């Protein structure tokens, strides 16, 4: 019969539940307060400055537990595992896990505009179509090509803008200003200069 031996665990944390863990779950995490953190120098520092760094290494108040378990936070370890779906159900239904910030929206725009032409029709056509015509995504040039063969609303607008306007509806031409006559370099003798008197 084989002999079963029992040995003490290598670490004191083996086989026990860890509440506060350090990096990589190596051991229980306990805050360490550094000694002698006050400022020592030649002159006394200004009153609004502080050299006391004890507040940086202060432990958590009453050693309180974290508010939620890690799998409850979106994107944390264990999040989205089917066994823990009951935790994340409301967040999945509301789309909370998908966040479009400034840079991700810019990346989406760059990808969606890659195979689109940035061509846009004349501003007069865009004005005729209304405020929604100046949209976010570029226009499709195919809607405006071969306008004689298409009957879409946009093609009709383009044809109308290209057609010559009748004389009565054209804006009137402004009269040209008369050219200024060149002044002679010499003044007549009978005119008196007011600066002399």
Curated annotation (Swiss-Prot):
Cited PANTHER family: GENE, 17359-RELATED (PTHR34833:SF1)
Pfam families (UniProt xref): DUF4562
Membrane-spanning segments: none
Organism listed in the record: Bos taurus
Compositional bias (Basic and acidic residues): 178-197
Signal peptide location: none
Protein name as annotated: Protein SPMIP2
Region (Disordered): 161-197
InterPro entries from the UniProt entry: DUF4562
Disulfide bonds: none
Gene responsible for this protein: SPMIP2
